[in-house]
Design a protein with these regions (language model features):
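Conserved acid/base catalytic micro-environments in cytosolic active-site loops
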Residues: 1-175
Length: 175
């Protein structure tokens, strides 16, 4: 990983020579970050139930998971969409009409349309994976960034939502 890739998502300036929102100016497709708490499976299922399989967008699901939990999310969500659902892998390019899931014990970012996985840092129990991804998404996709916050508790996602709005992207929050 280069020196700049390790910057905190949402830092000012350029990263590896790519200005904020440059990817969106190159005619790329929208990338939708979907944040949900550990109990948000039902909301996620309903969300994907109502989407066509050919949206032309990519979806990245950031869900709070217990580090010791073996997630069956890919299998469960596959029953609610015809899009390909898979666990995110480091360096994986994001493609249209696919759903990517954050693995347990990982932090997920996006840079130049590729997913970047890192070991989750222990910050005294404070982990904000939705904020981290949304801020990176805003920086990478600019006005094509979309943030969706589903059922949850706490403030995870608030800073990321602000970053997406500031980048000209769109934000939706479940009541």
């Amino acid at each position: 990983m280069s020196q700049n890739e390790g910057q905190e998502a949402g830092d000012e300036g350029e990263t590896m020579g790519v200005a904020d929102g440059e990817r969106s100016q190159q005619g790329q497709f929208p990338i939708v970050g979907v944040g949900a708490s550990a109990g948000g499976l039902e909301a996620l299922e309903k969300f994907f139930d109502h989407l066509p399989s050919d949206t032309g967008m990519a979806f990245v699901v950031i869900q709070h998971l217990s580090p010791d939990y073996k997630s069956l999310m890919a299998e469960l969500l596959s029953k609610h969409t015809k899009m390909k659902v898979m666990r995110a892998e480091d360096g994986l390019p994001v493609e249209r009409d696919e759903v990517y899931l954050i693995p347990p014990k990982k932090t997920l970012r996006i840079f130049n349309g590729r997913l970047l996985l890192e070991e989750q840092e222990s910050r005294g129990g404070l982990n904000l994976p939705i904020d981290i991804f949304f801020r990176a998404l805003a920086k990478d996709s600019g006005e094509l960034a979309v943030g969706v916050v589903l059922s949850g508790t706490g403030s995870d996602g608030m800073r990321g939502v602000s970053a997406i709005k500031e980048a000209g992207g769109m934000v939706m929050v479940q009541d």
